[in-house]
Amino acid sequence: MKERLLFLICFLCISFMLKAADKPVIKISTENVDLIYRVGDNGRLYQSYLGKRLNHATDIAHLPQGSEAYLTHGMEDYFEPAIHIVHNDGNPSTLLKYVSHTRNQVSPGVDEVVITMQDDKYPVTVKLHYVAYQKENLIKTFTEISHREKKPVQLHKYASSMLHLNRANYFLTEFSGDWASEAHVKEQPLEFGKKTIDTKLGARANMFCSPFFQLALDGKSEENQGEVLVGTLGWTGNFSFVFEVDNKNELRVISGINPYASEYSLKPNEIFRTPDFYFTYSFTGKGQASRNFHDWARKYQVKDGNQTRMTLLNNWEATYFDFDEAKLVKLMDDAVELGVDMFLLDDGWFANKYPRSGDHQGLCDWDETTDKLPHGVGYLTEAAKKKGIKFGIWIEPEMVNPKSELYEKHKDWVIHLPNRDEYYFRNQLVLDLSNPKVQDYVFGVVDNLMTKYPDIAFFKW
């Protein structure tokens, strides 16, 4: 009897192991971190693990199934989805199942895994991309969405990333502020419910809150100890980070374009690609997480990131709008004495009918103010060259003051709402860059400066 029972137990264990072996386990690794997905018996993809690298197959085999990797709208889960598609027949639900995955080396030390999922009732394909930077312990993720339905489908939400964590406590750090009062640090515990860091300001997305976050696990963040996940989105428009703690104290982090006013009509066979989400995971505090990002940015993101950076002297704080050629040349002398590489001429050098003596007029009239610069910008570029430093200049050709020659001639070039009064921020309006005439004008401003003054080495824009 005992032998039969032992045989039955062994048989069941072997059957379970063989069954588990049939289901793909997808491991995305850096030197210190593992992000592991597995396919469930129902064919759906689950995030099984995110944490310190696991080097033994037995450790991976004993991991739980986990949470659905890229949660869809309209099915049985009650929590915030990563994707919301309305099909061309009006069905607002999507159910994604695993199809395949690929793995390739992008470059030495950089690997990419692509997981393909499809809805088995609708011809919709979602690809999850993961690019792992080994030494920097940083992972880049983005999503591609396509379909072969007869008509366009509507994308209401399309996250770049969805991560799952299961810890005792979570402490979120965000960075908020305003002009001249940037990056106020606030750390707070996350408890049941949702916390969102987002913006709806479009091109001024970074105005009041920064598009990155810091998440400490189990305890508050410390500089040199503790587990910390830091994330950011490679996107200059509306962004959203949603942190949702559920009834089991499990945390979902959904990152991507803010769904607000961002519905997208996706045509058949068109591929929609989300922005990149970047995250790093440190086991020795937030200081190491910061260094991971710095190392990655210098090597992979910033041009000549590991080279010596140039320094510049900007006249703005020294003169504001009150300057002439003599003042600027004197500042160049000071720059040379300090060993600075470049002099930058900021706001206030342009406009004649309405000279740029303050921020209330002249913007978008890009001719040198003759009272301030009787010899033009060329005099300054030549002076800088003689002193052995480079010359840069400030422009903002997409903005306009109502008190300007350009506005008087082309009021129809500004963005405005019909039947509404104009609203001024810093006494200025935005030109409509969807207008081909405006595009030509803005291009002409930059082209004219570069052609007329080829020694301009830098634009502050």
Language-model features: where?
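Short acidic, Pro/Gly- and aromatic-enriched capping/linker segments at domain boundaries
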Residues: 21-25, 249-267
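Polysaccharide-binding surfaces and accessory modules of carbohydrate-active proteins
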Residues: 22-36, 44-244, 260
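An acidic- and aromatic-residue-enriched active-site/binding cleft used to recognize and process polar
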Residues: 40, 148, 158-160, 348-350, ...
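Aromatic-lined carbohydrate-binding/catalytic grooves of carbohydrate-active enzymes
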Residues: 304-454, 458
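Bacterial Sec-dependent N-terminal signal peptides
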Residues: 1-23
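Hydrophobic beta-strand core residues of beta-sandwich domains
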Residues: 133, 266, 371-374
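Short Pro-Gly-centered flexible turn/kink motifs
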Residues: 91-98, 264-283
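Terminal connector regions
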Residues: 279-310, 317
